[in-house]
Amino acid sequence: MRPIIEFCLSNLASGTQKAMEELEKDPNLDIIEYGCLSHCGSCANDKFALVNGEYVSGETNEQLVENIYHYLDENPMF
């Protein structure tokens, strides 16, 4: 089973598209887009994704990608 990275369409439109595109290059990740992830307050202010259901954010796309990989390293699925 691969880690699941979920993005909100509104957050993608606000700037996380490049982070998602970078993560899509990794064949070991499942990337999913949703209309809403119910984090509206955070969505308006942060670049974020849900990683296996947990909120991960970053100030830039590069930091978001880095934080996602850091989270995955610190929280292995098995």
Swiss-Prot record:
It holds the Pfam family DUF1450. Belongs to the UPF0349 family. InterPro entries: DUF1450, UPF0349. It comes from the Bacteria. Signal peptide: none annotated. This is UPF0349 protein BH3414.
